[in-house]
Amino acid sequence: MAPGKKVAPAPFGAKSTKSNKTRNPLTHSTPKNFGIGQAVQPKRNLSRYVKWPEYVRVQRQKKILSIRLKVPPTIAQFQYTLDRNTAAETFKLFNKYRPETAAEKKERLTKEAAAVAEGKSKQDASPKPYAVKYGLNHVVALIENKKAKLVLIANDVDPIELVVFLPALCKKMGVPYAIVKGKARLGTLVNQKTSAVAALTEVRAEDEAALAKLVSTIDANFADKYDEVKKHWGGGILGNKAQAKMDKRAKNSDSA
C-alpha cells in the first residue's frame, strides 16, 4: 500500500460483540429446553383441543357452514337485521302492549264481573285491551287480511323455513316488517321463552306518531330494499388457509 493512504472503512459498521451490561457472577443463565420431558411448557391457547359439548359444536359448525356455503338470497336476507337504535325504539313501543299475565287477566275479569253485578257494562269497568299479537299462524292470518301495522320477525328461527316466506308475504300485502335479532328477545315481549314473530295491529292514540315514525324508518331499511336484497347471495367466504392457498396460486400464475 502506498504511504499516506488509508484503508476504506467497512461498508457496514462491524457490530461490537462486547456488551456493556454488567453481569452478576453469582448467577448463571439457565436456558430452558421445551423438548419432550424437559422444562414445563409455556402457557398457550389450547381451546382448539377442548372437547366442547355437542350443542356448542353444532352451533359452531352451523355458523361456519353458513359462511362457507353459497346461501340463497331468500335465506341470506335474515343476516341483515334492524340497527340497534331503531330496534331499541321498536321494542320500547312493543313493551307498552305486552299481553296481560294470568294475574292481570284475573284482576280484569274480577273488575268486569263486579261492574256487571252493579248494572254497568264491561267496557266501563275495563277499557279495550291492546296487545302484541304472536303465534305464527295467527300473525300470518293478520298479514293476509292486512290488519297488522308492523311485524317483527326473528332472525334465528330454527328451522328457518317457518318464517322464510314472511318477508315476501309482507311485501306483497304492503305490511311493514323488520327482521330483528333474537327469538328469545321477541319471546320476552309476549311472556314466552321464544317467539318467531310478533305484530302490532292497533295502538293507542298517543302512540300513533311514534308508530308512524318507526314504520317510515323500518320501510327504508327493509320493504324499500327488498328488490335489491333478493338479488344478492350470501356466504361463499373461504377460510384463512383456503384464502392463503388461492392467493399463492394467483401469485404464481401472475409470475409465470
UniProtKB/Swiss-Prot annotation:
Residues 1-37 are annotated as: Disordered. Keywords: Cytoplasm, Ribonucleoprotein, Ribosomal protein. It is found in: Cytoplasm. Residues 16-32 have a biased composition (Polar residues). It comes from the Eukaryota. It holds the Pfam family Ribosomal_L7Ae. GO terms for biological process: cytoplasmic translation; maturation of LSU-rRNA. Coiled coil: none annotated. One of its GO terms (cellular component) is cytosol. The keyword Repeat does not apply. Its main location: cytoplasm. Present with 238000 molecules/cell in log phase SD medium. PANTHER family: RIBOSOMAL PROTEIN L7AE FAMILY MEMBER (PTHR23105). Component of the ribosome, a large ribonucleoprotein complex responsible for the synthesis of proteins in the cell. The small ribosomal subunit (SSU) binds messenger RNAs (mRNAs) and translates the encoded message by selecting cognate aminoacyl-transfer RNA (tRNA) molecules. The large subunit (LSU) contains the ribosomal catalytic site termed the peptidyl transferase center (PTC), which catalyzes the formation of peptide bonds, thereby polymerizing the amino acids delivered by tRNAs into a polypeptide chain. This is Large ribosomal subunit protein eL8A.
